Amino acid sequence: MDIRAAEISAILKDQIKNFGKEAEVSEVGQVLSVGDGIARVYGLDNVQAGEMVEFPGGIRGMALNLEVDNVGVVIFGADRDIKEGDTVKRTGAIVEVPVGPGLLGRVVDALGNPIDGKGPIQATERRRVDVKAPGIIPRKSVHEPMSTGLKAIDALIPIGRGQRELIIGDRQTGKTAIILDTFLNQKPLNDGDDESQKLYCIYVAVGQKRSTVAQFVKVLEERGALEYSIVVAATASDPAPMQFLAPFAGCAMGEYFRDNGKHAVIAYDDLSKQAVAYRQMSLLLRRPPGREAYPGDVFYLHSRLLERAAKMNDDNGSGSLTALPVIETQANDVSAYIPTNVISITDGQIFLETNLFFQGVRPAVNVGLSVSRVGSAAQVKAMKQVAGSIKGELAQYREMAAFAQFGSDLDAATQRLLNRGARLTELLKQPQFSPLKTEEQVVVIFAGVNGYLDALALRDVGRFEQGLLTHMRSEGKEILDAIRVEKALSDDLRAKLKAEIDAYAKNFS
């Protein structure tokens, strides 16, 4: 028997090299059945609920149903590449996404992967998507304004930082337009140096057309608003688990800012589609259906998401996360299951109506049905002073307008009320992409409630407003600055403002 020394030394070297190496142990299971984006897996005995698992080819999934003999896994991707008998690996990690300032200006999917072709994400850390909302002690009452730049909202339904304000209405009533204007309105704050005033924007698109999302991103980019925004997109062609996960992923990204003493606003567009995706997953996982075939925990799905929007107290960095959930109603039915759920969770709602939209009242806000339950505490004092009477006047106007259809001989007081109401309604109209600063809104509404529009023809109201703003930006600049700094209308400032509007109104023709 010949001894080959070279071979023996090679074997020994190999053995020495591998000495002390741990064998990699990973718990694996087998796919029992797969279909409709759901895989039944046998053998993952110690898997956690919500844990990420991996299929061959790098496809990821999430364990949702932990049953006696198998695990129900929802698949984040196409299930056509997964077949019966495939091995499934545990990752040991609950679903998490990258967070941090590196995501600003980017478009990502529900797992935080970039989909905008601008290279990898520079994330500072990763966070779990589904975490517990802050308790009662670390919170603080909402007290800072979150300006949308829309007169109808900032005057009548003010939103504060840390509030949850629902935007609800039928399709094509301008729900996304309100979100877009709100994002664009934050540009002056984000361009400034005051870090405590900056408001980062996160837009979560659930179940929308890709063209719609692309259009939204294009507008943000053209107007220089994408640099302080994050877009999380789970479009209509994405699997239901991605649409279910996207709002939670966006929320985790927003919580990074909230927990670091910064401010963020997140818009979920829209939660009706998330509920539909969740219903699809639940029914395929054979969970028992409830009202309208939604699962029993669909209320908890939305409440645990929206409770994460909060205003933190000073000990916790005094950051905030404001939520603007969107719900699409069918034929103005706000008493359906999902709309009533979300109305009861949020701190108020902005109700948009189709017939107002087609009458040319845009934003199509129904002032009677819309409320803000905590926003008035956050409203700027100057706005409170001028807008206090407008809500009452509009309510009276709507009531009278209904009766006025039947009678032609109305007394002078009623005529005056109808006249003023029509002009105030006209004044609250606003074209898209033209948000106004708070001090400019104060001036315009001041002119409206103090009778400067009463003598004008309805068609001239918009022209009067534009002219007044142009005049104030040049001639009355110090008055605008004073309103911005003082945040209130003192008697002296009120007199100056009155004189300035008088001077403009005299020359208006």
Curated annotation (Swiss-Prot):
The record marks 370 as: Required for activity. The keyword Ion transport applies. ATP binds at residues 169-176. Keywords: ATP synthesis, ATP-binding, Cell inner membrane, Cell membrane, CF(1), Hydrogen ion transport, Ion transport, Membrane, Nucleotide-binding, Translocase, Transport. Its EC number is 7.1.2.2. Signal peptide: none annotated. The keyword Metal-binding does not apply. It is a peripheral membrane protein. One of its GO terms (molecular function) is proton-transporting ATP synthase activity, rotational mechanism. Gene3D superfamilies: 2.40.30.20, ATP synthase alpha/beta chain, C-terminal domain, P-loop containing nucleotide triphosphate hydrolases. One of its GO terms (cellular component) is plasma membrane. It is found in: Cell inner membrane. Its main location: membrane. InterPro entries: ATP_synth_asu-like_sf, ATP_synth_asu_C, ATP_synth_asu_C_sf, ATP_synth_F1_a_nt-bd_dom, ATP_synth_F1_asu, ATPase_a/bsu_AS, ATPase_F1/V1/A1_a/bsu_N, ATPase_F1/V1/A1_a/bsu_N_sf. It catalyses: ATP + H2O + 4 H(+)(in) = ADP + phosphate + 5 H(+)(out). Belongs to the ATPase alpha/beta chains family. Produces ATP from ADP in the presence of a proton gradient across the membrane. The alpha chain is a regulatory subunit. F-type ATPases have 2 components, CF(1) - the catalytic core - and CF(0) - the membrane proton channel. CF(1) has five subunits: alpha(3), beta(3), gamma(1), delta(1), epsilon(1). CF(0) has three main subunits: a(1), b(2) and c(9-12). The alpha and beta chains form an alternating ring which encloses part of the gamma chain. CF(1) is attached to CF(0) by a central stalk formed by the gamma and epsilon chains, while a peripheral stalk is formed by the delta and b chains. This is ATP synthase subunit alpha. It comes from Chelativorans sp. (strain BNC1).
